[in-house]
Amino acid sequence: MFSNISNQKLVLFFTIILIALCPFVYYLWDNEILGIGNWGRKRKDTFEDKNCSTEIEHAIEEHKRKNKEKKEAKEKRLAPGRVKISTYDVNNENYLLGDVNDELQPNIPGYLTKETAYPFDCEPDDRSNRWL
């Protein structure tokens, strides 16, 4: 049947046919016709029917809440080897305090408490309320 057609022409013919079928195969794949294509992805019509949009909104809110909690925890946490120091006045005397609640975590090494912070060799700077 193909005795007078060379092999190159035959390969070229089948290649052109395959290229011509690609858009049709993609259409079948993308629209899940005949049950093929896009495994694991929900179709748009079933997505709305199952009311998944509210589930997504709840998931987004939960994600934002977790990120906010992580950010707040990071702000409260101190890096190792660093002390966050603040000043406050008691009876018109400045005390340095670390970022530690004395009732919950008393006498932690490396943190300054009211008992260990005063007196220092330096005097507080009245203009900026900081220790020199």
Swiss-Prot record:
Keywords: Coiled coil, Membrane, Transmembrane, Transmembrane helix. One of its GO terms (cellular component) is membrane. Residues 50-79 form a coiled coil. The chain crosses the membrane at residues 10-30. It is a single-pass membrane protein. It comes from the Viruses. It is found in: Membrane. This is Uncharacterized protein 169L. It comes from Invertebrate iridescent virus 6 (IIV-6).
